């Protein structure tokens, strides 16, 4: 189990560094003579037509609706494994990261709404600073190498997984519009078939893939965000077969490098390019970017620390063995690294009348995430022992 966790963390850490490179490249492209090429490429129309089925979207929408469905499938597989056998499988293990994640979602949303309470168009972005980018956070932590105890990495991992689950619920409840009854019925039938496959003990992944594709198309057409199909498929794939093998873990291990080194960097490159040329100081200090940046930089650590402190004082949770508040505090700051997850919610929140706020939102995400990464890194570096020393 420990080896699996170490492998997971090493992949996520390397992926976080690659994500940083993708964000930097996107910013360079968006603010150079290549800007037109960058935007034109992302808005290239791509159509798939099979009989009466017609899916016509720009490349950036294929990335956000299609590739990210695979990423959310991986999240679903991770959540299922951790709930049944991993770091969230017992109340003692799950309590602290659960309370921390809840606080870390409430406080950033509240701070954002304080700055945007008067504008109903920008209010819809309240969930943007509530997310944590697990790959980026672990990537920053990886820069400190073996000085970081595995227990601290597992705490951040568990917190981020619960945070991701919260994001899934938020997307389902608040960012689904113009629902199609027929598509929802087809999606429901697909879910029934997936559950039936699970109950019948079907461990071959191909049937889940075929029905899962139907589910993804139905959800895409229904008005509910298509990425949720990935989570549903993941929850239906068996964790254990009768012979002791794990179809779920096999798929998770197969998806992980693709998600870490292909899907998320492509998503970051497609969504992080903010054109700064037309922005004024007033734009930079407007409610949307300020609310997001402060939500990530202040709201995240305040929520994580306050809810964790109260839970420990009420004996509802306990600190990880060998860890103190001086270790938890900089990790709480690192939870303010929103990046890809925050950008994903931003792409759902600011559409239609609010589309003009998209660049401002991404600017706030980049500002808050970078500041959280820098402060969290140096703070954690200061409290951790040097190599060869004991904490």
Curated annotation (Swiss-Prot):
**Gene3D superfamilies given in the database record:** Na+/H+ antiporter like domain
Give a Pfam family name. Answer: Na_H_antiport_1
Q: Which InterPro entries match?
A: Na/H_antiporter_dom_sf, NhaA
| Ranges annotated as spanning the membrane | 14-34, 59-79, 95-115, 124-144, 154-174, 177-197, 213-233, 261-281, 292-312, 331-351, 363-383
The reply on keyword Cell membrane is yes
Q: Which GO terms describe its molecular function?
A: sodium:proton antiporter activity
- GO process annotations (BP): regulation of pH
Subcellular location field: Cell inner membrane
Q: Which domain of life is it from?
A: Bacteria
Q: Write down the chemical reaction(s) this protein catalyses.
A: Na(+)(in) + 2 H(+)(out) = Na(+)(out) + 2 H(+)(in)
One GO cellular component, as annotated:
plasma membrane
Q: Which UniProt keywords apply?
A: Antiport, Cell inner membrane, Cell membrane, Ion transport, Membrane, Sodium, Sodium transport, Transmembrane, Transmembrane helix, Transport
Topology versus the membrane, per the UniProt entry? Multi-pass membrane protein
Its function, per the record, reads:
Na(+)/H(+) antiporter that extrudes sodium in exchange for external protons.
Cross-referenced PANTHER family, in alphabetical order?
NA(+)_H(+) ANTIPORTER NHAA, SODIUM ION/PROTON ANTIPORTER NHAA-RELATED
The text of the family note is:
Belongs to the NhaA Na(+)/H(+) (TC 2.A.33) antiporter family.
The protein, known as: Na(+)/H(+) antiporter NhaA
Species annotation:
Shewanella loihica (strain ATCC BAA-1088 / PV-4)
